[in-house]
Amino acid sequence: MLAGMPSLSHEEQQEAVERIHQFMSEGMSSGEAIALVAAEIRERHQNDPQAMAIFEDTDFDEHDESDYRRDNEQDADEIEDPYEG
């Protein structure tokens, strides 16, 4: 799965491409058409157990870096490097 999109069969991929081309032939920009078809696909696969959540950067804004550390190990910039001159 890429970018939060469920895995699609070849037939589903072809249908998506055809929908995108249809929207574009009606005057919609390629970006808008792709976004619309992607939203439709996500909606159809909303309860799909194979669909994986993709997190936005803002999901982690409430946490400090220390929230993600597993131990008290020093940061790399705190370790003395014997090879530095």
Curated annotation (Swiss-Prot):
Record field: compositional bias (Acidic residues): 74-85
UniProt feature, compositional bias: Basic and acidic residues: 9-21
Pfam family, one: UPF0181
Region (Disordered): 1-22, 57-85
Alphabetical list of InterPro entries matching this protein: UPF0181
Organism domain of life: Bacteria
Protein family: Belongs to the UPF0181 family.
Record NCBIfam families: PRK05114.1
Name of the protein in question: UPF0181 protein YE1782
